[in-house]
């Protein structure tokens, strides 16, 4: 490991331990400088948590770092190699438009990845220009920070700079670079690459590094790789349940977009569900609904099976025994996910301890929500506030009957109604990043007006507040978002 130098006025303290891994797993690559970088968004609270002094980050030297025009002391820029399944088909991938600057060592001693997204071509660009447009980078900033507010594990967004250069997509767009922050950028697809093209020693080096980076409490285990598989399965079961509980649809659950850390990563074609429907899809490229809302849990399990396959040489010396171990661990995912989801759903209804009939109560509500095309978020907000709008659901006899059963269930528990209501407020967001609100913010920002985006971010950072200033953001769009489509921006 290199000697770490601190740039005292800003707090940068960079290292790159990933670059100590076998050279097959990455390529050294500097960002491509841009013409006229301008800082347009800075996440000051995140900067401070990383040990950076936000007041200095607006100066030209630091804007140059965010743009890739300057390499900070301690940084060793690399593009990471990975290969995985995109819509079920295996491809050679890798960071085609992203550069890992290194790991910022925080005041608490954590190592946090600092990556530039849209920073130019790399050996993995596969014909792409390596650049990003302003809209998609701001979109990732908004949604990732909304997920942080929702208390869902996620990569974060530190800054967005415009480049002063155009990006050619269907139209000519403003170029931009996002500074993404993550526990790491190690993916299922990273392991797939190592298993496909690396040696067993290189695969083992990656696994050992991952364990040290994310599961450092493992000590003296006979086989730490079984524990690695178990922990990744547990984290993904928890993560996907949290997505489902708030109606988040990732949109592109390829294996390169499943982080070993258990954080949500890559916010290209994601969106939040309005009307409750398991078949909801927003991504323009997901024509078959592979990554629909209802398919997210089984797709996560499928991705984890691909991860388990990569670990087979490490799980046991005997291949058949390795397969048996992997299958046994994978078989636990469905129950782990369901337990997390059910625990979250009863909390959304103000129920503290599970009873056998609770699942039927939940499924009954969801079925009538689907029948009456009810808004997912606002239905639970109405239950929380005990204020029922003119939503068709609330006028139905089915809802009246369900409401009686729910009240009877609440009356059977020993906790007070006040405690139950507080549990609901902590479990049901009052606001989510409504698709039309995000589009409004992006449209204004592309015209140079960031006030709409900043107001939206302020509300989204505390979605459980149930405050008056949030009320306008819980409103539904005037027109249905059923035809709303999202794009990955590449």
From Swiss-Prot:
- Where does this protein hold Mg(2+)? 257, 266
Co-factor requirement: Mg(2+); Mn(2+)
Family annotation (InterPro entries) = SelO (IPR003846)
Which catalytic reaction applies to this protein?
A: L-seryl-[protein] + ATP = 3-O-(5'-adenylyl)-L-seryl-[protein] + diphosphate; L-threonyl-[protein] + ATP = 3-O-(5'-adenylyl)-L-threonyl-[protein] + diphosphate; L-tyrosyl-[protein] + ATP = O-(5'-adenylyl)-L-tyrosyl-[protein] + diphosphate; L-histidyl-[protein] + UTP = N(tele)-(5'-uridylyl)-L-histidyl-[protein] + diphosphate
Keyword list, A-Z: ATP-binding, Magnesium, Manganese, Metal-binding, Nucleotide-binding, Nucleotidyltransferase, Transferase
MF terms from GO for this chain are: AMPylase activity; ATP binding; magnesium ion binding
User: Where are the catalytic residues?
Assistant: 256
Gene name in the database record: ydiU
List the EC numbers from the record: 2.7.7.-, 2.7.7.108
Q: Does the keyword Nucleotide-binding apply?
A: yes
Family to which the UniProt record says this protein belongs: Belongs to the SELO family.
Q: Which residues form a coiled coil?
A: none
Q: What is this protein called?
A: Protein nucleotidyltransferase YdiU
Where along the chain is ATP bound?
94, 96-97, 117, 129-130, 180, 187, 266
* Entry function: Nucleotidyltransferase involved in the post-translational modification of proteins. It can catalyze the addition of adenosine monophosphate (AMP) or uridine monophosphate (UMP) to a protein, resulting in modifications known as AMPylation and UMPylation.
Q: Which PANTHER family match?
A: PROTEIN ADENYLYLTRANSFERASE SELO, MITOCHONDRIAL (PTHR32057:SF14)
């Amino acid at each position: 490991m290199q000697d770490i130098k601190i740039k005292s006025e800003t707090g940068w303290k960079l290292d790159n331990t990933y670059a100590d891994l076998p050279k097959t797993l990455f390529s050294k690559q500097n960002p491509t400088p841009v013409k006229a970088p301008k800082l347009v968004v800075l996440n000051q609270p995140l900067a401070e948590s990383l040990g950076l002094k936000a007041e200095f980050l607006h100066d030209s030297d630091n804007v140059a770092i965010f743009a890739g025009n300057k390499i900070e002391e301690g940084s060793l820029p690399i593009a990471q190699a990975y290969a995985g399944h995109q819509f079920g088909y295996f491809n050679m991938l890798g960071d085609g438009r992203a550069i890992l600057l290194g790991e910022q060592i925080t005041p608490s001693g954590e190592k946090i990845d600092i990556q530039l997204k849209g920073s130019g071509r790399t050996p993995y660009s596969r014909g792409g220009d390596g650049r990003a447009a302003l809209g998609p980078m701001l979109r990732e900033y908004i949604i990732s920070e909304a997920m942080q507010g929702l208390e869902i594990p996620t990569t974060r967004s530190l800054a967005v700079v415009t480049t002063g250069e155009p990006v050619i997509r269907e139209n000519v767009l403003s170029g931009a670079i996002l500074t993404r922050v993550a526990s790491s950028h190690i993916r299922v697809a990273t392991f797939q690459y190592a298993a496909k093209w690396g040696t067993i020693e290189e695969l083992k080096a990656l696994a050992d590094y991952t364990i040290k980076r994310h599961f450092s409490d493992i000590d003296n285990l006979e086989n730490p790789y079984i524990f690695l598989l178990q922990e990744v399965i547990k984290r993904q079961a928890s993560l996907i349940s949290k997505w489902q509980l708030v109606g988040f649809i990732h949109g592109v659950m390829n294996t390169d977009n499943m982080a070993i850390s258990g954080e949500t990563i890559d916010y290209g074609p994601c969106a939040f569900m309005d009307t409750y429907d398991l078949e909801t899809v927003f991504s323009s490229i997901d024509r078959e609904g592979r990554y629909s809302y209802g398919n997210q849990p089984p797709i996560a399990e499928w991705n984890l099976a691909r991860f388990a396959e990569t670990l087979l040489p490490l799980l046991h010396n005997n291949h058949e025994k390795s397969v048996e171990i992997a299958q046994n661990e994978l078989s636990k995912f469905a129950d782990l996910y369901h337990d997390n989801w059910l625990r979250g759903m009863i909390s959304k209804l103000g129920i503290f301890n599970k009873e056998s009939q609770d699942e039927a109560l939940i499924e009954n509500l969801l079925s009538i929500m689907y029948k009456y095309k009810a808004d997912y978020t606002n239905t639970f907000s109405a239950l929380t506030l005990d204020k029922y709008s003119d939503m068709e659901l609330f006028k139905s006899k089915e809802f009246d009957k369900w409401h009686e059963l729910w009240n009877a269930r609440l009356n059977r528990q020993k906790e007070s109604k006040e405690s139950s209501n507080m549990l609901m407020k902590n479990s049901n967001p009052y606001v989510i990043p409504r698709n039309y609100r995000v589009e409004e913010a992006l449209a204004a920002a592309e015209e140079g007006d960031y006030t709409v985006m900043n107001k939206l971010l302020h509300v989204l950072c505390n979605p459980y507040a149930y405050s008056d200033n949030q009320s306008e953001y819980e409103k539904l769009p005037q027109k249905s978002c059923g035809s709303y489509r999202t794009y990955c921006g590449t």
